[in-house]
Regions:
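Extended, low-complexity cationic-aromatic segments
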Residues: 1-135, 270-271, 275-277
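Acidic/histidine-rich, metal-coordinating catalytic segments
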Residues: 2-4, 128-131, 142-162, 182-193
Length: 299
């Protein structure tokens, strides 16, 4: 499963505790416009390996997280900014890059379009071709950790994911190997493990980490990415496994409601008893009752 997410260099919590008696002094921060707050986009990939049925539990792992960036050609020499005594910013510090140098910039995610040297893009096709597909091949191929498993790839219907060239490539690649490419239905983030659980968890931890390290200030794009990568690395696999089981059970609710998502507004909309029925392991979840669930086709 894969998806994209923006991480911001500053996130203010409306209900953060501000109690002077406890040593938590009220502080304020204002930005003239949201565009003044740095951000970077990441693309994350998770996986869940199981036998016969997700209801049997399984092993989850992180395939990777990638910053949406590409090389750009510098059009002029750039120096570091130096704050002057009167508070003004003057670009008179050491040389950062010279005209003609290549440097990495954050950019938009596309399906196949690499953009230009002046306006580069981050194409998903290249990421799948050079990294994701080879990594999955190593996992499920001969001698791999999950030899014999059949990969099923799921993404949403965002613009880059629906790019004709990208879809043609990934569907053809999967078809040639007996794999499956199964995009989720539109407007159903509750069926995507990343939107459902992983990204909300990461977002909260990212904000806490940034606040602990840098205080109440806007982080640079590099600092924002470093924090996102750190949060990703400490994300526990069993939490991802739990999210896969949760999404599977939510899908059953969607089917029972004939596609209607009104149940999500109820108090127990996304609560499906995962903690009740499963216990966590180091890298996944197992059933508490020890039962083995047959494949759906044989049930």
């Amino acid at each position: 499963m894969f998806d994209e997410k923006w991480f911001w260099g500053l996130v203010l919590r409306s209900y953060a505790k501000q109690v002077a008696e406890l040593g938590i002094d009220p502080r304020s921060f204002a930005a003239y416009h949201r565009n003044h707050i740095n951000k970077c986009m990441v693309v994350a990939f998770t996986a869940f390996a199981f036998v016969d049925s997700i209801e049997n539990g399984g092993v989850a792992f992180k395939l990777g997280i990638y910053r949406a960036e590409a090389h750009k050609v510098a059009k002029q020499m750039v120096r570091e900014a130096v704050r002057q005594a009167d508070g003004r910013i003057k670009y008179c510090g050491p040389v950062v890059r010279r005209k003609g140098d290549l440097y990495l910039v954050d950019c938009a995610v596309t399906g196949c379009n690499h953009g230009t040297l002046d306006n580069p893009k981050f194409p998903l096709k290249a990421l799948f071709e050079n990294k994701i597909f080879p990594d999955v091949e190593a996992l499920v191929g001969p001698g791999g950790q999950f030899e014999g498993h059949i990969p099923i790839f799921q993404g949403d219907n965002a613009g880059p994911h629906a790019d004709a060239g990208f879809v043609e490539y990934v569907e053809g690649y999967c078809r040639s190997r007996g794999w499956h490419w199964e995009p989720q239905a539109p407007q159903m983030p509750h069926m995507n493990v990343l939107d459902l659980s992983v990204f909300p968890s990461m977002s909260k931890q990212h904000t806490m980490l940034c606040r602990d390290k840098e205080g109440l200030k806007v982080l640079t794009e590099d600092q924002t990415w470093d924090a996102a990568e750190e949060v990703w690395m400490v994300l526990e696999n069993w939490k991802i496994a739990s999210a896969y089981i949760q999404a599977y059970r939510i899908a059953k609710k969607v089917i029972a409601a004939k596609g209607n998502n009104g149940f999500l507004g109820n108090g127990d909309g996304i609560h499906v008893g995962v903690r009740r029925d499963f216990q966590r392991t180091e890298n996944g979840m197992v059933r508490i009752d020890g039962n083995v669930i047959a494949p759906p086709a044989a049930a």
